[in-house]
Amino acid sequence: MAKIFIDRKNNSLLFAAVLLVCFLVSVLVRYQQFETWKKTPAAYFVGERPMMTTLDAPYWLRWAREYNEGIYKQKNGLRAYPGGTDTFKEMSLPLKYTDTAPASKSSSLSLSSGSPGISYRDVPLISYLIAHLSPFFNNNYYLTGTLLIPVLASLFILPLGMYFFRIGVPVSGLLGGLIGTFAGGYYMRSSIGRIDTDMLNLFFPVLAGLLILLAGKAKTERNVLLYSMGAGLSLFLFQWWYEKAGFTLAYFMV
């Protein structure tokens, strides 16, 4: 009995080590793209800002900056421009231009004091993470988001490997993680410069699936509740990250 326990423990440690290696390989391959960019900064950087390879990236980064500055969504003139502007909708030029009325003293004081009413839940999770990590990168939001990509895009490998290990096919979990992270579509959408929600769109569903599996295999009511809470939390974070409620409903249907 003791020998079986030791063998199982050794197998678990060996699998954990190999799984960690697969995760690091995925991280380093993506980070190597950034190192290649640094060799030709004139082509890939504007000052200290790395270029973006998706149109959504400046959108998330701007919201991260506005959240830190306390002006989140106070002005949203860049969204839906020019079709969202009143002038465009009216399809005519204004007859005259007038200055806006000067703000009262009380309103000026309230604006200068920032916007303490901004809730973290109102900010997309990707922007929230970048906003809080940007001080570690000298408030360079572009660099912060870029360096998050290799780690976040590779995270799904860990719960995927653990899932297949728990059902008795660990090799499938390891190969699935490696094939998945370097699959053409996912690799393209999670490469350096793609600051977008694709980075964690595999991680949260796979994590929820793992926790549901663990809840089904749990021996005590306490563990069932803990794993179920974890699954609910992962789906909550997925909703905050991607804002597509259909995925959560699909899990309830299953």
What are these model-derived regions, one by one?
Residues 1-16, 114-118, 124-128, 144-146, ...:
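Membrane-embedded, hydrophobic transmembrane alpha-helices
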Residues 1-44, 166, 174:
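Start-transfer (signal-anchor) and selected internal transmembrane alpha helices
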Residues 24-154, 183, 196, 203:
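Membrane-interface coil-to-helix junctions
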Residues 26, 34, 147-163, 171-254:
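Membrane-embedded helix bundles of polyisoprenyl
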Residues 52, 161, 168:
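General nucleic-acid-binding
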Residues 136-140, 165-171:
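Secondary-structure transition/capping motifs at alpha-helix termini
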